[in-house]
Amino acid sequence: LAKLSIYGNDYDTHAGTVVRDYIHVVDLAKGHLNALDYVLSHQGVDAVNLVTGNGYSVLDVVAAFEKASGAKVPYQIAPRRAGDIAVCYADATKAKNLFGWSAQFGIEEMCRDSWNFIQKNPNGM
């Protein structure tokens, strides 16, 4: 098994790796359906974040995936990528206020469901 490359471990974050906002595909799909219902009954345009509003470090995701799969994820620390910022996540308040949507799944469920999909579909879709 190849090793996962984690780009940088010296960021000013709780785990030293970059922090990002990850979203479950089901939450994203439901968010798009809520947004579609909203635009069909309202005029104008608006930008809305479909996000969890929670930041997880790369090492948080690795740990959650290890828990979901029951296997260690081999990884190596690689040099930082040019331009990567330490923390990037967004606010989902507007989606909640405009069309009643908020993410329901956390990182543990995301990794569990990803692992289950991989197990059931070893060759992809």
Regions found by a protein language model. Give the residues of each.
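C-terminal substrate-binding subdomain of Rossmann-fold SDR/epimerase-dehydratase oxidoreductases
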Residues: 1-125
